Amino acid sequence: MIIEVSGDILLSNAQVIAHGIAPNDDFAIGLAHSLRESWPSMYKDFRHFCQTQHPKAGTLWSWMGADSKIVVNLFTQEAAYHQGEKPGRATLPHVNHALRELRHLIDSEKFTSLALPRLSTGVGGLDW
């Protein structure tokens, strides 16, 4: 069942929070920044993951905090090519591939609830 709500996604009782980002994102603005502020260790683990695994757009990376909150980072944008550059815009194919991976993750892990913003409509630049 899908229920549309408004408000601060960080206050959600959902088991999982998912959002769209770019590989090597610096989590400096938008929801990513709020997540970085709420779970600094997630950002540290994310940086390590990106440096060692070199993720591609259209995939995902999930993280679970000490409070059992799960954050799924959907790679909906191309990575910045050089240090200090902005990442590319989101594309519908990247969003679709990442959402398919999210569905597989939900099915395999038996997640019961998910909070998902309007993907890639802020920094990603897509229309809702």
Language-model regions: role of each:
Residues 1-128:
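Macrodomain-like recognition of ADP-ribose-binding/processing modules
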